[in-house]
Amino acid sequence: MPESRMPPRKLHIKSYGCQMNVYDAQRMADTLAVEGYVETTSAEDADLVILNTCHIREKASEKVYSELGRLRAAKDQAARDGRGMNIVVAGCVAQAEGEEIIRRAPMVDVVVGPQSYHHLPQLLARAKTCGRALETEFPVADKFGFLPQPSRQAIRSRGISAFVTVQEGCDKFCTFCVVPYTRGAEASRPVAKVVEDVRRLADNGVREITLIGQNVNAYHGEGPDGRPWPFGKLLYRLAGIPGIVRLRYSTSHPRDVEDTLIDAHRDLDALMPFVHLPVQSGSDRILAAMNRRHTADDYRRVIDRFRQARPDIAFSSDFIVGFPGETEEDFAATLALVGQIGYAAAYSFKYSPRPGTPAADMQETVSTADMDQRLVQLQNLIDSQQSAFNRTALGRTIDVLFDRAGRKPGQIVGRTAYLQPAHVEASDAIIGQVLPVTVASLERYSLFGTLASKPTSGEPSNHAATGGAQFQTTAGA
């Protein structure tokens, strides 16, 4: 008789927050693929559901508990159907609230922090034996040394853009931020390991790499010479890997912008002229209260250094309004800084106190009404700058890396150097190619145009055109 085979078990991962979580979700899927799990888009049909969580803002945490309430019903239904469902809470909420999650959501089987994903198979086995498993320590061993490499099929299914973690953790201890407590101290991967990952991705059709870390430009991984390499030197090394046509990185800290990074933007065509450089506030008084350890003028000087090296460079940033003690004068300084820099995009949020951070104990709170008013005012200014920046593309011919099929039949979508979505009518054979597009119109934040030259023959993409890495802020900088 032929040997019977167990059907594959179904895995559903829902990620919240930054692109580090997107990368972590992929590595968890790779780890569990070895155990016979295949991904599904339906949580209700899954044998294993993982919530990969974010702890940056209060609402993000509460969303997790709301989702767990929904999953409890799905788990009960699975039991009535005669099958099991395991629920895992991973990520930064797991790290920060481990025991509290078990108390509030007893249907959870495993709680695992972001440094222990490689232990998922063992934790699931422990939960089966003991009822549940929790692991939120910061292990001494490097988790990356234990995570399996993604299969060729997995790489190709994820698109022509990919994230690669090169640095994790944060030593800055901004007073509003939980990242040092949930991700641990700054640690950098060795140059050789990063190069190995990028080569493997390039060999399987990836064309664009986004290097990620909580403070990515604090990178100091060991080079082949046995010495720590600065981030800029790593970029020079990766730019020489065949097949990689675009390099990006996020998130940066103004204090860690060193000369080799500036030089890389001057010298490397593959390094995109778009930098996410969070500043959080334009007020020196508030920056000091945040423990940012730089002034608004320090930030302006960093921007000037980038622009001198690469005149076509553009910037995005993060801002917090309503930080404890923020006055109208402090907020006016933020508006002034935004007006002086001129951003292509930015992310702005109302201050959200996080338990365990120094700012959560500060007494000079700002009213909700004032925070709401300031957020609207700041976002209106940022939106006007982004619209003005996008209008500069009208009538111009710009390079676009095409990465997926559009929503409309016959439409292909790519991204410019500045991450603007660009839509053209074309065959999906152009996916994976960088082609010039003449921009004819704008719609909200997207560009629409026509190909200015014929696609390269014989270079169709082998990817399922499901989209690749997209820009979000990585918490920590």
Swiss-Prot record:
Pfam hit, one: Radical_SAM
Major localization class: cytoplasm
Low complexity bias: start-end ranges: 464-477
Cell location: Cytoplasm
Enzyme Commission designation: 2.8.4.3
Gene Ontology molecular function, alphabetical: 4 iron, 4 sulfur cluster binding; metal ion binding; N6-isopentenyladenosine methylthiotransferase activity
Gene3D superfamilies on file: Methylthiotransferase, N-terminal domain (3.40.50.12160), tm_1862 like domain (3.80.30.20)
Matches recorded under InterPro entries: Elp3/MiaA/NifB-like_rSAM, Methylthiotransferase, Methylthiotransferase_CS, Methylthiotransferase_N, Methylthiotransferase_N_sf, MiaB_methiolase, rSAM, rSAM_horseshoe
Protein's UniProt name: tRNA-2-methylthio-N(6)-dimethylallyladenosine synthase
Organism listed in the record: Nitrobacter winogradskyi (strain ATCC 25391 / DSM 10237 / CIP 104748 / NCIMB 11846 / Nb-255)
